[in-house]
Amino acid sequence: KYTPGSFVRTKLRRLILPFIVITTVTFVPRALFDSMSDEPFPLTLDNFGRSLVYQDCMPIPFFWFLQVSFIMLSLTFCVLYFSGSRRVRPAAVVLGLLFLAFLVAPIQVTPFLSIDRVRDFGFFFIAGCLYSLYSARIDRLIPWTDIRFLSASAAAWIGLFLLFEDSPLRFLCSLTGIAMCMSLARIMEERRWQFLDHLKAANYMIFLLSWYFNIAAQQVLAHFVALPWWVHTSLSLIAGIYIPWLGYKYLEKHQDNRLIRITSYILGQSFRKRA
């Protein structure tokens, strides 16, 4: 059973260690290829420091997700842990956090440590926690596997996106998009569509490393070779998924090697020990 200390340490290794290592390794090459990028990225010590703590300065733009995940997971676990020791029901705590997330959503906050993204996505994270508490009841009420529900949620998502893209009500678009994705996933599960199953263990590795191959296919290659846009996009998609997947498989196969274990550790990967 986790304590707050052990839980936070686990998430530091899983999320923050890969963030620091990969950001540091990526910083210099990203700055050297500044001329090929859409936005300036200077090779300075100040910019390096900012790239570790400000989400709008990161060399890999979507790595804010690691900081946000760490903050939300750690805070939520600690709040639930200490409220549980005082015999407060988890549902009451989660509802309180959900209300708090809704209240702070319009407030302007700093991008330091991706706090602004915590504000943006906190409501949806806590809503997911609430769903996990009552999933059995909710699933009885929502026809996830009905094609009509999938179609309706997809239509609502598109319509709300067009209506509220730059509106405070855009969170409705996100909710319908989440419902659409959940419905599609349930339909795939029910019909045993398993063509993506080979990727599931490597999804975190794909997230961590896909950016390199996306950039190589879309920007670096395009700088030297003029190909149709769909070729660059297809190469980016395939390389961004399957090269990290191959890397994961290699680490998994050679986990008895000390260097491989170290590499796996700093990338936040964990493999079951072989019998």
Task: Identify the role of each PLM range.
Residues 1-11, 21-38, 213, 217-218, ...:
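Juxtamembrane transmembrane-helix termini
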Residues 1-3, 78-85, 104-107, 127-139, ...:
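Structural signal for the C-terminal ends of transmembrane alpha-helices
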Residues 14-74:
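Membrane-interface helix-loop-helix regions
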Residues 73-98, 130-151:
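Solvent-exposed interhelical
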Residues 93-106, 148-162, 178-183, 236-249:
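Hydrophobic core of alpha-helical transmembrane segments in multi-pass integral membrane proteins
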